[in-house]
Amino acid sequence: MSQVIEPQLDRTTYYSILGLTSNATSSEVHKSYLKLARLLHPDKTKSDKSEELFKAVVHAHSILTDEDQKLRYDRDLKIKGLHTYQPKKNCHIFKTKAKESQGASPTLGQSEAYHRQNKPYEQQPYGFGVGKKMTSSSKSKVPIFKSFNLKSYQRNHYYSSKKERKHGSPDIDSLFHETNGASKVRMTDAGKMDTNSQFQEIWEILGKNAYTHKSYSEDPNSCLGSALSDHEEEEEAGKQQQQQQQQQQQQQHYGMTSKSSSPDEEKKNNKEPKRESRVSPEENGEEETGHKQFKLPKTSTFSSGSHDSNLQSPFYNHEYRHYARSKFECKNQFRKSVSPIKEIPATTSANEGWNILRDIIEKLNISNVDDRNKDLLFRRDEIGDKNHSDSIDIENLSIKEPKGMKRRKKDDISLEELFQSLPREKDYFMMDAINDSLESINLFKKPKTTQSHEQGGTFAQAESNRAKFKPLLEQCGITPEILDLEIPEIPEFDAVADLETLKLNVQLFNNQCNKLKETIHQVSLQRLRADTQFSDMLTQKQSIMVWKTYLEFDKSLMDKLNILQERQMQVIKIFSERCDGKV
């Protein structure tokens, strides 16, 4: 029987084919397409409808991935009212359907296949078509950790086959199993087997009565135990394992408490698990009468030579001891380091030192209290009259300084001086004497601290630094007035006919120009000296703009000098021409 996938798709819209709504994104469309394509591909499934559905999925994916076709299709869905259509819930659920395989034998039933698996190798049929293909559900469910004894296995099958030949009974396994492989053995709530007519016939053939479920499960040679279903065998194996674990835990607990308990209790505890593993004598008697030839010597599960030899050990055997030791070592490896200060115990010497110091402090406190009680701050003078009044006179009281107080300074005012300066109770305070009292007080001026001088020096230094970075224009040789000086104009020599007057005018013009030249040269020389003096300061970043203004002043000064030179050249040229013409 093979399994075939029967797909179901909602083919109302292209979105519903892919199991999506109209709001799905392109990535969701692509993911749904890949998922359905893997399931509906003709090479992957043997269903007749898979090819047609696969083509529909591919067509829907091609339309929804194309933007133009998707817009047109969405417009058509809105017109038809299917834009908000939700795919059906019962679709996109792939059901598996059982299908008969052509190669399998139709005559072979499940009971026969199950019966074949339970037979030993030498009794199994061989050839083609005698068995079924092993699947995950039909595999043996016997746990892999179950112990296997070859001799007992062969002996059990030998005895069972011998008894079948003796009684001539049919195959018992076929009677105990239905077509679906489930066991017909039914257990009641009380733990006994359901004794119907069919089972009575079976037990009459075998020559036995129905026993309790516990005796059949414990007896390895029982024919009923071999006929139980796999599910019941698993339950029995699990119960046996739980019982063994509980018995091992009890045995380990008895070993741990062997030192503290008495010898009688140790013997009693060691005997208890053995009693539990034994079967009642009535059941043993019935088993011996029915199956004397099938009985095997029972071995106690707790017979261990190592444990019997060493009863004082808390472990059942060396495996438990090895497990406990390895677990302890692993736990110590991953344990965090503990601070060594916490592990150091408090020494007695340190405690004694603290105790001595505490005793000294207590003695000092007691002595201070006694002194305060004995020495009163105010002592009353003795009065001769016995019938003295209870009123206290301030004049007769003497003030004594207590022992615990520090010595007062010379400048401090004592209580006696304060008593003399204060007015009496009946005397009124006169405001006229305030001026005299204020004048009598000597007021001393506090000297200035060194910190104030240091702060003043820092401020002065800062101001000097600012002056260095911003020098005055006069120090740099800049005189803006020289730029305002007018250059003398060229005189009109055409109106002068006399040569002597011409010479006088030329000399006057030349003298004015020379004076102006002299002042310009003096200013330029002063500027040159200032540049050499403040060269370090001018090359700093904050003084670049100042240096630029200085150079602009020098340029304007040189322009003025050039204009003056040109005018002098023109006057000399005119004077030379007039002299040549007169001659």
Curated annotation (Swiss-Prot):
Q: Which Pfam families match?
A: DnaJ (PF00226)
Its BP terms in the Gene Ontology are: chaperone cofactor-dependent protein refolding; protein refolding
Where composition is biased (Polar residues), the residues are 215-224, 298-313
Report if keyword Cell cycle is assigned: no
Q: Where is the composition biased (Low complexity)?
A: 240-252
What else does UniProt say about it? Present with 184 molecules/cell in log phase SD medium.
Q: What is this protein called?
A: J protein JJJ2
Q: Which organism is it from?
A: Saccharomyces cerevisiae (strain ATCC 204508 / S288c) (Baker's yeast)
Its encoding gene is what? JJJ2
